[in-house]
A protein has these predicted regions:
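Active-site loop ensemble at the mouth of alpha/beta enzyme cores that anchors a bound cofactor
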Residues: 59-136
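Active-site loop/helix belt of alpha/beta enzymes
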Residues: 1-91
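Short Gly/Pro-enriched turn/cap motifs at secondary-structure boundaries
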Residues: 33, 92-94, 138-142
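C-terminal accessory subdomain/extension
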Residues: 108-207
Length: 207
């Protein structure tokens, strides 16, 4: 169908279903998709359309680079999180975002509370983040809007943060976490050297 103000210039083939942890299984699934996408491009070319293809999210884009000359479109581009770092070991992601918070109380001998509630970190994943330096040593008790209560696992009680101590939480899902803040502080060699404004959090419909 002809539309006077619309031109077909490309295909955006996002395949979020292929976020498979095993790299060989991921590559196998994406190989099938690339074949389909190439066939579609060939059919469109017969009809007179020269199109580009944009494909591949954060877990998938390295596979597309091996299999095609498509443009790739990783969504988690600047700051990696604990979710992708754990799920895709083959990609050797380094966590590059954390939330600075503080231990505000010791409800009992095992538990401690951080001032990092659901207002401070994305609440969509079941495990919303990990405490840097205490990975695997704590259990989550509860989280509400302002606070997050943890329990030290048996044998690690001596590592419980002191009241007033600064603690760093690495989010499981950085994308909606970053949208909760107007800017991010940039740290290099343990020193704050600048800040980045989070422009994408300011959304507005203009039509």
């Amino acid at each position: 169908k002809e539309l006077s103000n619309v031109n077909l210039v490309g295909l955006h083939c996002y395949d979020g279903q292929n976020g498979i942890s095993d790299v060989n299984e991921r590559l196998k699934a994406i190989t099938k998709l690339v074949d389909i996408e190439k066939d579609l491009v060939a059919e469109l070319k017969k009809l007179g359309y020269e199109v580009m293809v944009i494909s591949g999210g954060t877990p998938e884009f390295p596979c597309y680079r091996k299999l095609s000359n498509f443009y790739v479109s990783p969504g988690t581009l600047f700051l990696q999180d604990d979710g992708y770092s754990n799920a895709f070991k083959d990609m050797d992601y380094e966590c590059a975002c954390c939330i600075m918070c503080r231990c505000v109380s010791h409800p009992n001998a095992e538990n401690f509370t951080l001032d990092c509630g659901t207002k401070a970190i994305a609440s969509d994943p079941a495990v919303r983040g990990v405490i840097a330096g205490l990975e695997g040593k704590t259990e989550i008790v509860l989280q509400n809007e302002e606070h997050w209560v943890f329990r030290m696992k048996a044998g690690y009680e001596n590592l419980k943060p002191k009241v007033g101590e600064v603690v760093y939480v690495i989010p499981t899902h950085v994308c909606p976490t970053s949208a909760l803040y107007p800017y991010a502080l940039v740290v290099r060699d343990h020193k704050v050297v600048g800040s980045w404004q989070i422009f994408a959090r300011n959304r507005k419909i203009i039509f």
